[in-house]
A protein has these predicted regions:
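Structural preference for solvent-exposed beta-strand-turn elements
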Residues: 1-249
């Protein structure tokens, strides 16, 4: 056995809460679709973020990381393979925007590990109705077609990542679209993060009680600059210390 001596200490001071990775992920995507350069501070690298940065490069967006600041320079899609690493969120977030920007040409997504075993059926059932073709080749997913304007019905019990991907993709189109949630939306908070990021980029979505999302066509993403919001779940630990009488803010 090991004896540990714990000496109480008086904690006080100011703590900077790490940036929300979920918010950063969505802001990074909005910045990549903007009509100018964006600079986001408070950026924390992660496997998902690295995968998204790599994927966005194939869609024409260059990202440069310096300290905790990421510079995003949008560009013209190169048509190269979109490598999503092992990130399910990257794959689900990028499929609709890639279809919106592809001009109907074939798009290849690459994955590692068991990524291509992750569920994607909500997209396929929607897109097949719109004439989008897809096939899986081992760790590659090949899709051909265009993201079309119109109405899309999704279950609220599936991952909110599908809703986020559709919101981002449909906002890139010229015509109006609507997403209908067929039952209770389970992950409202994550969808709200997406709507907040889009609003910061100048893109409006009419949220009708999280049951219908109306996306006006012909909008343009504006550059997004500033600090990424803090992660409230990580900040809760320090708030707890403050409630216990410690002078932590």
């Amino acid at each position: 056995f090991m004896n540990l001596l714990i000496t109480p200490a008086k904690l006080q001071g100011t703590v900077k809460v790490p940036a929300s990775k979920s918010a950063a992920h969505r802001l990074l995507l909005c910045a990549a679709f903007a009509n100018g350069e964006s600079r986001l501070s408070g950026f924390s690298p992660s496997a998902d973020m690295t995968a998204t940065r790599n994927g966005l490069k194939a869609l024409g967006a260059e990202t440069e990381l310096s300290g905790d600041t990421v510079l995003v320079r949008p560009g013209v899609p190169t048509g190269g393979e979109i490598d999503c690493g092992e990130s399910g969120s990257t794959l689900r977030f990028l499929i609709p925007p890639a279809l919106a920007l592809s001009g109907g040409r074939e798009i290849a997504f690459a994955g590692h590990g068991r990524l291509m075993e992750r569920p994607l059926s909500p997209y396929f059932s929607l897109f097949e109705e719109k004439g989008v073709r897809w096939r899986q080749e081992g760790n590659r997913l090949v899709i051909q077609g265009k993201l079309l304007t119109g109405k899309y019905a999704l279950s609220g019990k599936i991952s909110s990542q599908f809703v986020t991907g559709l919101l981002l993709g449909l906002a890139l189109l010229e015509g109006d679209s609507e997403i209908l949630i067929t039952d209770r939306l389970e992950s409202k908070g994550y969808v709200d993060l997406t709507l907040c990021a889009m609003e910061r980029a100048g893109v409006s979505v009419e949220n009708r009680d999280h049951r219908r999302f109306f996306i006006p066509g012909g909008q343009k993403f504006r550059p997004v600059s500033g600090e990424i919001e803090g992660d409230r779940s990580e900040g809760a630990f320090f708030l707890g210390m403050d409630f216990l009488g410690r002078q932590v803010s």
